Amino acid sequence: MKNNSIRGCAYISDKIFEIIRNYTIKYNDIYITVAGTIGDVGIVPIEYNGANLTENADKLLLNNQICKDWFVLYLQSEYCQMQIRDVTTKVGQPKLAIKRIEELFIMLPPYNEQKAIYKKINCLFDYIRT
């Protein structure tokens, strides 16, 4: 889970699946890495629909007042990444606790504004790529 993509998947036995069956991700879910490379964020692609989530990442569930695409860009922003670095535990193996994610300061504009911001930024990214 890096650079808005998922690679290097491992497979588990049916026995393990029964134990962790509640920790799955679906197509279009938002994920954030919480151990190893901390703070990478992305949206689950269709080919990983139903995949199991490890302890190195969390699934983020949003209410209907938050535009998913805008929220991913916000989490990837330097402002939010700085907050993530500040709240990551640094003793032993660095880790980003769920409680710390819940406490991140999110500047939440109205939904229509979120969509407009995402659309504008996405157009700029398209322009940069060409």
Feature locations, PLM:
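Short, conserved catalytic or interaction motifs in soluble domains
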Residues: G36, I46, L62
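Short amphipathic beta-strand starts and helix->beta connectors
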Residues: V44-I46, V87-K90
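A short glycine-rich beta-alpha junction/loop motif
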Residues: T37, G50-D58, I66-D69, T89-Y111
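Conserved aromatic/hydrophobic "specificity hotspots" at molecular recognition or selectivity sites
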Residues: L60, N64-Q65, K120-L124
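Interdomain signal-transducing alpha-helices
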Residues: F71, L75, Q114-I117
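Sequence-specific dsDNA recognition surfaces
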Residues: M1-Y27, E47
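Amphipathic alpha-helical coiled-coil/heptad-repeat segments
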Residues: Q83, V87, E103-T130
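Short Ser/Thr-interspersed hydrophobic loop/turn segments at strand-loop and sheet-helix junctions
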Residues: M1-N3, Y23-D40, L53-A57, V72-R85
